[in-house]
Amino acid sequence: MSRKGKAKKRKAERLRNKKLIDRYPWISPVNWHWKRIPSYDFTMYDDVPKGWKRAFGKIMLEEYREALIRCNYLDKFQWIQVKEKYGTLRLYSNAAPKEVSDLESKYDHISGYFCIECGRMNVPVLTGGWVEPLCEGFKRFLREEIK
């Protein structure tokens, strides 16, 4: 890809991120003091694995938005860290009302039933001591890659 093409792609990503952050302000990146960074280069939502985004990403963001609006907490809530741990999605945030905290538990639980790569429903697979939520297709793909 040319330099001009890369610049165009980055600009499109920033515009996409700005739209996401405008609608879902808690996905804005934060610094070490949990202060929002005025940047659209990335979002906390970028750390959600692609399979989980496909399976329930938009639904999850909308559920958070509705709960935060009901609790009048939309501008006070912030995701601090997003990651996969022990085969499930972990969403770490600042203090929030119980209704919002319950969503973190909900998505922690249901994420373990979806493939982290493609979003298909699956059963968590134990591979080499690691819990990896992969569907059979991706499990076979990984085996062939290792050979």
Mark where each language-model region is:
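Short, flexible, mixed-charge glycine/proline-rich loop motifs
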Residues: 83, 102-113, 124-129
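Cysteine-rich micro-motifs
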Residues: 129-141
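Short Cys/His-rich Zn2+-coordinating modules
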Residues: 74-76, 94-104
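Short functional micro-motifs and their immediate structural scaffolds
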Residues: 121-126, 140-143
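Active-site acidic/histidine clusters and adjacent loop/turn architecture
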Residues: 39-90
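Short Lys/Arg-rich cationic patches that frequently serve as NLS/NoLS or arginine-rich RNA/DNA-binding motifs
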Residues: 1-19
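Short cysteine-rich clusters marking metal-coordination/redox-active sites
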Residues: 115-118, 135
